[in-house]
């Protein structure tokens, strides 16, 4: 794809897919990698870079304020890019690809999961009532309300998302 301003300035973009972006988020069951799932080894071995699916694994991190940088790049489906991808994300995509009307639609799978975290960390600032911090759900990592949302969800708002799959234990 070439974009030009009408003069001598142009930008060439290669390997572009236009399709549906799905976000997968939640706790440890969503975080479970494809390599750990029944049928995962076979799915990983069968992956080829010409599949019309791209994956984006958001780094596990927090922030006190909303961030704009994702800190990761879209990757082709290969045996190297899939082992730690959410198994739920992969099998969901596989299920979508079985529908005849969706077989030609490229898919973007965003894995933004973090096991052992409380729901409050994934909730935008100001959406929770003012409650004492001692009443908030515990987190294995001591993550504060909105801190996961700020770092692992807000940067994704640049994408038009088809849907979100949430898996809270």
Could you tell me what each predicted segment is?
Residues 1-169:
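Cell-envelope and extracellular/periplasmic
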